C-alpha cells in the first residue's frame, strides 16, 4: 500500500444525519456485518451536541447495492481512511465500530497513526473480541440454512427479513461478504495505538465474552477502559441513550472538554463485580 489514500467519493461512504460543522469532534461510525449507515441514525441523534456522527455506508447494500462488496477488513479500512480524509486532515476525529465495524475501526486507526501520523481522539470498539485472539469460526462458509440460523442466534436482524425470500436474495450476498471479512481478518502485530481505547460489550454476548473483549487493552499504550451493558451481541438496540452518553462523556473527558457530564470513564461489571479498566497494565 502507498502512503497516499485511495481516490474515493466521500459522499458515497459517509452519511451525516445531523450535520454539526462546528462540532468539537467527529465520530466515524462503522456498522456490523450486514449493517448500514442508517443503523446509526439514532446514535447520531443521541450523541452530545458537540460530537457529530459520520456514519459509514459499505458498498453492496441499500443505495450502494449495485456495487461489489469488499471482502476484507484491510480493504474496508483503506477505503474508510480515504473517505474520511477531509475530516482527519482537520484533526478531531474518533472511531466507533460494532462487531465487524470494530475491526475496521481498529485497522483504520492503525493506518492513520502509523502511515499518516494522525492520532485519533479515541477508538470505541463494540461487540468484538480483541484482534490478537484466535480468528472466528467460518460461519460465512455454511449453507444458507445454517448461516441464517447463526444470524437468528445473534438476534440482530428483524425476523420479517429472514422470512422474506425476496429480501433474503437481496441481503444475503452482503451478509456473507461481511462475515467473510470479519472471519478471515488476521491481526498482524505492529506498534500499539497511542490513542484512548474504550471497549463496549453485552454481558451475555456469545461472540464477544467480556474477558476476551478486555484484551483490547493490549492494543494501545494510551488510556483504556471497558464498559459492559446488559444484553447479547446487539445490546445496543435497547440502550442507545446510555451508550451515547457514555461515549460522549468519555470522548469529551479524554479531550479535556469543559462540557462533559462526568469526570471519570464509565465503570464496567465483570462477573458481578464492579471494576475499573483504565490502563490495566
UniProtKB/Swiss-Prot annotation:
Pathway: Antibiotic biosynthesis. Disruption phenotype: Cells lacking this gene produce less than 5% of methymycin, neomethymycin and pikromycin. Its EC number is 3.1.2.-. GO terms for molecular function: hydrolase activity. Residues 26-249 are annotated as: Thioesterase. Involved in the biosynthesis of 12- and 14-membered ring macrolactone antibiotics such as methymycin, neomethymycin, narbomycin and pikromycin. Responsible for removing mis-formed acyl moieties (aberrant decarboxylation) that are bound to the PKS and could block it. Catalyzes the cleavage of methylmalonyl-[acp]. It exhibits some acyl-group specificity, and catalyzes the cleavage of propionyl and butyryl derivatives faster than acetyl malonyl or methylmalonyl derivatives. Pfam families: Thioesterase (PF00975). The lineage of its organism: Bacteria, Bacillati, Actinomycetota, Actinomycetes, Kitasatosporales. Keywords: Antibiotic biosynthesis, Hydrolase. The active site is at residues 99, 233. Belongs to the thioesterase family. GO terms for biological process: lipid biosynthetic process; macrolide biosynthetic process. SUPFAM superfamilies: alpha/beta-Hydrolases (SSF53474). This is Thioesterase PikA5. Gene3D superfamilies: alpha/beta hydrolase. It is an enzyme of class 3 (hydrolase).
Amino acid at each position: 500500500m502507498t502512503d497516499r489514500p485511495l481516490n474515493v467519493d466521500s459522499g458515497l461512504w459517509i452519511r451525516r444525519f445531523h450535520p454539526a460543522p462546528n462540532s468539537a469532534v467527529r465520530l466515524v461510525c462503522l456498522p456490523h456485518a450486514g449493517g448500514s449507515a442508517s443503523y446509526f441514525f439514532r446514535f447520531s441523534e443521541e450523541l452530545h451536541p458537540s460530537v457529530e456522527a459520520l456514519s459509514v455506508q459499505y458498498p453492496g447494500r441499500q443505495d450502494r447495492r449495485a456495487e461489489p462488496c469488499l471482502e476484507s477488513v484491510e480493504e474496508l479500512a483503506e477505503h474508510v481512511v480515504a473517505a474520511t480524509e477531509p475530516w482527519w486532515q482537520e484533526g478531531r476525529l474518533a472511531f466507533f465500530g460494532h462487531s465487524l465495524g470494530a475491526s475496521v475501526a481498529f485497522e483504520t486507526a492503525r493506518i492513520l497513526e502509523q502511515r499518516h501520523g494522525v492520532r485519533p481522539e479515541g477508538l470505541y470498539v463494540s461487540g468484538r473480541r480483541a484482534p490478537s485472539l484466535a480468528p472466528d469460526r467460518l460461519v460465512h462458509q455454511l449453507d444458507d440454512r445454517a448461516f441464517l440460523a447463526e444470524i437468528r442466534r445473534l438476534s440482530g436482524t428483524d425476523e420479517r427479513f429472514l422470512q422474506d425470500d425476496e429480501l433474503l436474495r437481496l441481503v444475503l450476498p452482503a451478509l456473507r461478504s461481511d462475515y467473510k471479512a470479519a472471519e478471515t481478518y488476521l491481526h498482524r502485530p505492529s506498534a500499539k495505538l497511542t490513542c484512548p481505547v474504550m471497549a463496549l460489550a453485552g454481558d451475555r454476548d456469545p461472540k464477544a465474552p467480556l474477558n476476551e473483549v478486555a484484551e483490547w487493552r493490549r492494543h494501545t499504550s494510551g488510556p483504556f477502559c471497558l464498559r459492559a451493558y446488559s444484553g447479547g451481541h446487539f445490546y445496543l438496540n435497547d440502550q442507545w441513550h446510555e451508550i451515547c452518553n457514555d461515549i460522549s462523556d468519555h470522548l469529551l473527558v479524554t479531550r479535556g472538554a469543559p462540557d462533559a457530564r462526568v469526570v471519570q470513564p464509565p465503570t464496567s461489571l465483570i462477573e458481578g463485580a464492579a471494576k475499573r479498566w483504565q490502563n490495566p497494565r
